[in-house]
Amino acid sequence: MKRRHLPPVLVLLLLSILSLSFRRRLLVLQGPPSSSSSSRHPVGDPLLRRLAADDGAGSSQILAEAAALFANASISTFPSLGNHHRLLYLRMPYAFSPRAPPRPKTVARLRVPVDALPPDGKLLASFRASLGSFLAGRRRRGRGGNVAGVMRDLAGVLGRRYRTCAVVGNSGVLLGSGRGPQIDAHDLVIRLNNARVAGFAADVGVKTSLSFVNSNILHICAARNAITRAACGCHPYGGEVPMAMYVCQPAHLLDALICNATATPSSPFPLLVTDARLDALCARIAKYYSLRRFVSATGEPAANWTRRHDERYFHYSSGMQAVVMALGVCDEVSLFGFGKSPGAKHHYHTNQKKELDLHDYEAEYDFYGDLQARPAAVPFLDDAHGFTVPPVRLHW
């Protein structure tokens, strides 16, 4: 090194030392980064988050079904033989062959009381209004926005917050558990898909504050009971117990209208249709954990996940959505009947043993485990600004 370059180099070195010293003092004064600033970074694997946030073919399909019903559905009712009841038909135009003109195809058929329903035109208008609200919610969520913001609104939907909540799953592991009194001691008890409690009280309790169902349950109730039972007999825990329902098929919104039309003051039909944002949030969480489990178990790229799961039908379980709802309305959440063991029935109240392929139960178990042990690691809930995951306990 030539001597004439030495002084400038020393000057630069001195400035670097002074700058480093100043930065250290500044860091001491400011302290470490706050948790709020660090929480702005999305939780979880970025690629899996991006893939999970894609609503996929299933969402597109249900939107297309709702739009087609809104535009083309017709409703007709006819008296039965002897005029004991009326037959209701929901129909859609359908081309039975490529060259044939479309003809009405029956989508749903119900037997209803003679005088319980409004005229066909008014009933169709009400059905279209329900479909319109359903489509609007889905389209708003499709345009982006923070779907996790729904977590701050859930308490308002139920009218209040609750201190302790029990979400009672339907797993056969509850049989012989003796958890009934422990479940009933909670302020809010959520049960799934109208599972029976009679005969199982010692293990599952009897108290029910909210019934959470998928719309297939309501459809079955309406098909069986609309003719004979007020409000379709779809509130087995009592008419005062509200039902929260997520929509599997848009046509099931007609069942809700029918059951509401046959309700009476002594047999009301309190129904809450889940917010489209809650549906989207649950779908993303379920898909994220399923993607993560697939990558971990197979070593394959996440893009290959569709080889194992058909996106058109993949869906979170009713229990998982009930758990997410409880997170938004409860200060403490306890889960019962969400595990499985060798030889245990799939449902404690039926003889079913096989799990449904459209759900990834193992991935959902991973989600519940994170809620209990690592709540800050749950993706997408971190997008709900101002929301903190309450303590969660798994009792299986």
UniProtKB/Swiss-Prot annotation:
Keywords: Glycoprotein, Glycosyltransferase, Golgi apparatus, Membrane, Signal-anchor, Transferase, Transmembrane, Transmembrane helix. Expressed in stalks. InterPro entries: Glyco_trans_29 (IPR001675), GT29-like_sf (IPR038578). It is a single-pass type II membrane protein. One of its GO terms (biological process) is protein glycosylation. GO terms for cellular component: Golgi membrane. It is found in: Golgi apparatus membrane. Residues 24-396 are lumenal. Coiled coil: none annotated. The chain crosses the membrane at residues 7-23. Residues 1-6 are cytoplasmic. One of its GO terms (molecular function) is sialyltransferase activity. The keyword Ribosomal protein does not apply. Glycans are attached at residues 72, 260, 304. Pfam families: Glyco_transf_29 (PF00777). Its EC number is 2.4.-.-. The keyword Membrane applies. PANTHER family: BETA-1,6-GALACTOSYLTRANSFERASE GALT29A (PTHR46779), SIALYLTRANSFERASE-LIKE PROTEIN 2 (PTHR46779:SF2). Belongs to the glycosyltransferase 29 family. Does not possess sialyltransferase-like activity in vitro. This is Sialyltransferase-like protein 2.
